[in-house]
Design a protein with these regions (language model features):
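Long, charged, low-complexity, helical-prone intrinsically disordered regions
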Residues: 1-385
Length: 385
């Protein structure tokens, strides 16, 4: 049963060897709409997480696809559990968070200078889209770097989080803002969802993207009335025969998509090097309970205390998470360096594993704009097995 549940979870995540998504930009949109969100991250020791997550799923993925889809008003940037790309069709479900920020209920976004915010809005309304560094040069000269780290940045963040500004494109990682009304497609639904509708939205995202989950995983970071409303939605879905409750050996109850249970699960998963911020990995409780994989990203850990490496990437092989590989893209010399490789004892058919890893590293190098792979560490470990 555990093996089947792993396969369900991976298939729902679009991580089978044969992608369920179309190629190119259309597949990128399909993947984001299916997953519900893709997390944005700035770490660039290898290609950034939002690109990596989509590259792992979408054939012929290109780094330009996200900006293209934002310009086409098919996706937008906002907060999910972190900064993320979200489907534009789900825009109305971001409205409660925007309203909360506007009311001053946010712990983190309630410090914008109202006078400066009004000035920024007036300028954008008159002159068009704007970057943080486009703020009045006189202010920059007289007040040093205030516009980048102090009131200026906070004002932009406040306007963005409360829904007055949207990110209309990026130049690299630099954000370009415009008025929200200029960024939204015509006839978009702007009705505020009820608490019940919002709970349904969150439940459907989890069911569609994961297929199997515990109560703890379903309501992760959810509180109070929302949490209780999600309990109502879950019960309704069980009663309707959409979800089946399965008791695991450890006593936990797992809620599983009934249609997924009935699917053929003999899919080949191959080998994939995943991002630490991949949707399949981001909830660590899911990893330990379903995959028995204790994973921790170590870039925030002091160097002396790291075990697996600064930016160790999980390795998916068949339907198991079997190791961690720490890589660095040396872009000036176009070389992908494998710094370390740590394998679990569960790796089966090691010869085939290393063949698949070699192929994946070549693909991963090309994705990182590298033409060669320094895999001396891999060869050394392979020789000792």
């Amino acid at each position: 049963m555990t093996s089947s549940l792993k396969k369900i979870a991976l298939l729902k995540q679009g991580l089978g060897k044969n992608s369920p998504f179309a190629a190119g930009r259309q597949g990128t949109l399909q993947a984001i709409e299916h997953l519900g969100y893709v997390q944005i991250d700035t770490i660039s020791v290898v290609e950034r997480a939002h690109h990596h997550i989509l590259w792992s799923r979408v054939p012929d993925y290109d780094l330009s696809h996200l900006n293209s889809l934002v310009r086409e008003r098919q996706i937008f940037e906002y907060w999910y559990h972190a900064a993320s790309y979200l489907p534009m069709k789900d825009y109305r479900y971001a409205l409660p968070a925007m309203m909360s920020v506007r009311k001053g209920e946010s712990r983190y976004f309630n410090r914008g200078d109202q006078h400066l915010m009004n000035e920024i809005l007036a300028r954008v309304r008159a002159e068009g889209k704007i970057r943080l560094r486009d703020i009045d040069k006189k202010n920059k000269e007289s007040l040093g770097n205030w516009w980048n780290t102090g009131p200026g940045r906070r004002a932009f963040e406040q306007l963005y989080m409360q829904g007055d500004l949207m990110i209309c494109e990026r130049n690299g990682m630099e954000k370009v803002y415009d008025l929200t009304e200029r960024c939204l497609p015509e006839n978009i639904d702007l009705s505020l969802p009820t608490l019940y509708e919002y709970a349904q939205y969150l439940f459907n995202n989890t069911l569609r993207a994961h297929g199997a989950f515990t109560w703890k995983q379903l309501v992760h970071l959810k509180k109070n009335d929302l949490k209780e409303t999600m309990r109502v939605v879950l019960k309704e879905q069980i009663d309707a025969g959409v979800v089946s409750a399965i008791k695991l050996a450890d006593g936990q109850t797992l809620y599983v998509d009934v249609t997924a249970i009935e699917q053929q699960l003999d899919t080949d998963f191959g080998l994939k090097i995943l991002s630490p911020f991949d949707n399949s990995l981001i909830h660590r409780d899911r990893l330990t309970s379903l995959f028995e994989f204790d994973y921790r990203i170590e870039c925030y850990v002091p160097a002396a205390k790291r075990v697996f490496g600064y930016f160790c990437l999980p390795i998916l092989y068949q339907n198991e998470l079997v190791g961690r590989i720490d890589c660095k893209a040396h872009r000036t010399v176009k070389e992908l360096e494998v710094i370390s490789l740590h394998l679990e004892k569960t790796v089966k058919d090691k010869e085939h594993f290393f063949f698949e890893l070699d192929q994946e590293l070549k693909r991963f190098a090309a994705f990182n704009q590298c033409s060669t792979v320094n895999d001396k560490v891999v060869k050394l470990i392979r020789s000792k097995l």
